[in-house]
Structures are given as C-alpha cells and as structure tokens.
Amino acid sequence: MTSLDSILADKYPAKAHARRVAEGLKALGHSGGAIYLEAQKTRLIEDNDEPVPFRQRRPFFYLSGCLLPDSSLVYNIDSDQLTLFIPPINPDDVIWSGLPLSAAEALERYDVDNVLETTEVNATLANIAASHANNSTAFAIAEQVSEGTKFEGFSETNFNVLKGVIERTRVVKDSYEIALLRKANDISAKGHIAAIKASKSATNEREIEAAFIATCIANGAREQSYHPIVACGQNGATLHYGKNDEDLIDPVTNRRKDNVLIDAGAEYRTYCADITRAFPLNGKFLPETRQIYEIVLRMQLECIDMLKEGVQWEDVHAHAHRVAIRGLLELGILRGSEDELFDKRISVAFFPHGLGHYLGMDTHDTGGNPNYEDTDTMFRYLRVRGRLPAGSVITVEPGIYFCRFIIEPFLKNPDLQKYIDVGTLNRYWRVGGVRIEDNVHITKDGHDNLTTAPKTIEEVESLAA
C-alpha cells in the first residue's frame, strides 16, 4: 500500500470539519447550538422512471464523508456530538438494489459519533434544544431542508450564515483532502497519457475523450469533475468547447489537423482534478504552435514559482500577462512597449480568462470572492481575489488563444489596432489555443504541484509520436 493509499484508508475527517465550521460560526458571534445538513435527495428524471445522476451535496459531505442519498446530519456544537441519519430499510428497494448500509456499518465507515435512522431527526433536534433550555440556535441551509424537518424548541433557526461559513472553511484543506486531490490528479494524469496515445489512431475528438474517461473509471474514478473538453485545431480557441465530436481530418486538405487541447479531470470521492494539456496530432508541433506553447509554459512555470502563503493572486495573474506580452512581442504579433501594452490591456485579446481558481470538492471551488462586475477587463474573470492561504489548492492555467470573436474587436478599434501586427497574426490563427493547467497546493514554505501529467514539449511529443 502506498503512503497515499494508507492515508486514504483512514476515515474522512468529518468531525474535524464540523469543529472548524463551528469555530467559524463562533467567530461571527454565534455561540453553541446545532448544525443541520441534508444529503442530496434521490430524484427521478421528470419524464421517466430513471434516477437523476447522483451528486452528493458538498456541505453535507464536508461534515460527514458520506455518499449516501436521502441522509442528514446533526452536529451538537456544545457537546461535540456528530450524528449521521440514514434512511430506514425500504423492502421494495431491497428487491431491486439489495440491502443498504446498516447503522453499525455506517458507524464503522464514517467519522461520526452516532448513526440513527432519518425518522429520528426531529426528536434528536428537539432533545438538543431542550438541553439548552430552548435558548439556542439551529443553523441550516434554507434550500436544503426537507419540508418535514422541524426545529422545535430552538429560539432561532438561522438560514443565513452556515453556507458561507462552510464555503470559507473549505478553502483551507487538511492533509486528508490534499491526499484526495492528489489521488484525483494521479488518476487524471493516467487519463491524459491515455488520451494522447489514443489520438494517434483516433479519427474524431470523441475517441480521445473516451480514452480519458475509460482510464479514469478503470483506475477508480467513476465521475468526472466536469464534462471534458477535447478540442482539435481551431476549436481550441473556444475556452469551454463542449462538442467533442469533430473529425480530426480536415475536410478541405484531407490531412490530420495540427493539435488538440484537452481539459479534463477525474473526480475521486467528490474531490476534483482539473488539468489541461495541448499536444500535436502529427507527432510534432508546428513551428507556430511550438512558439505559443513555449510562451504559455513559461507563463505557467514562472507563476507557479511565485506561489507561497500570502501571495497576492492578482499579482500572479498580472505577471502571467506580462510574460505573455513579452513572448508575443518577440514573435512580432504585438507592437509597442511592454508597459504600454500592459496598461492598454492588449494581452486580454489573447489571454481573456483568469489565471486560475480554487479547487476542491467543486472544480470552481468556494471562497474565491470573484468580482465579475470589475470594469478592468484583465481582472474581471479572475475567480480568486486576495491573498492565498496555506492549505488552499489553486489551478494555474495560463493560455494564449487565437479567437476571432475576441481579437477582431481589438483590430477594429482605432486606438488599439496599432498594437497588433495583422500580417504576423495571420500565421497563428490555425494554432487555435494552448492552455496548460496544473493543480497547486499552497504551503507555508511555498507550494506543492499535485499534477504529474507530462507537459514539456519533449514529453508531449514523445507520447504523441
């Protein structure tokens, strides 16, 4: 058993998470009471009898580690008792699905103090309220409370603060969560290698996607963090391209297209990987694509080197733009001085998105405090604002794209068109887009890159050859 697997053989640290959330509530002036959370409900697709694909509610999982639907939990803050409630046995369900997890098995599996049936929720809540002389608060998330759940005896039911406290608490991961994210990355790296190898015989984007997903499932990750992006040729200029169904053969030239951008990550026990790579379809990058790849890789490596506890994320993002500007100046795509191009935000035409986002149980994880109303186009789509704490995990995903819809308004703007050399630019449209994305754990001493998928030009070309 590897050290990673030995860590994950222990229970998910739900009790520690409950305590941290309680501390977050106390920091806001709320003392004592009870936290109540519900799992995702079993639901059917609206027009047939098949279930909606199950995705556990993240607040519930964070305080339970439990993937069972139709469950709930109560954390008594004052007595430090965490109780999990699981559905009673339904004989009709047993006919089709077999016996569910028993209370004894659940107590053995999860980091909780008690396991009861969901029929005991209201009585348990009432007992907690009575033990505080009916002078305490129940904390819950309004849109995640079943109609039959009652908070009798509590002097207040607060639906306003719990969700935000959990989301802020989730930013800083413990060692178990880092192990889950590392496992998701390890599986995803295998998927990316398989996808690149599959491209050699593939004739359509969907075959590359299939190789990635199949490898993830075979290695223990049945779910994807998000729908994979597999974009060949100029499709790579679309940031969240989702079709994944275009032929790899150009119908005009009858030749294979130049390159593929794949953005894909496995989800392992609710924790997400988010990795992007670009690779050639013909074994070697074209000169123009190689030049752009070198710039993007330099953007990423320099930004990763800046990462440590307390670094201002906006500064790292701005540095990525400066590296992009220098590279595009060297190629002759941009004209002018670095400072003028930066101040005029010309690089936004080629790098329109944020450098990265928090990562955890959600791909775009909680706590980033973005400002999508920012009038500064360089920072509008930056999903994390502020200083990075130790224990956070963030993606570093610079990119350069040749998207006509984004670039042409700059070319038509009388004040901005002079900064872009159209003649040189025309040689690069076929590149589409290059993005390189890793998942990085911020530590007190610096950082730890969780992503092992190959990314040097030599590594990628060797796999694609």
Swiss-Prot record:
Cofactor mode of binding and number, as noted: Binds 2 manganese ions per subunit.
Any single GO BP term: proteolysis
E.C. number: 3.4.11.9
Positions contributing to Mn(2+) 2 binding: D263, D274, E437
Entry-linked Pfam families: AMP_N, Peptidase_M24
Record-level Gene Ontology MF annotations: dipeptidase activity; manganese ion binding; metalloaminopeptidase activity; peptidase activity
Positions of Mn(2+) 1 binding: D274, E397, E437
SUPFAM superfamilies in alphabetical order: Creatinase/aminopeptidase (SSF55920), Creatinase/prolidase N-terminal domain (SSF53092)
Root EC class: hydrolase
Keywords of the record: Aminopeptidase, Hydrolase, Manganese, Metal-binding, Metalloprotease, Protease
Keyword Hydrolase annotated: yes
Family: Belongs to the peptidase M24B family.
UniProt name for this protein: Probable Xaa-Pro aminopeptidase pepP
The organism of origin for this protein: Emericella nidulans (strain FGSC A4 / ATCC 38163 / CBS 112.46 / NRRL 194 / M139) (Aspergillus nidulans)
Taxonomic classification: Eukaryota, Fungi, Dikarya, Ascomycota, Pezizomycotina
Gene field: pepP
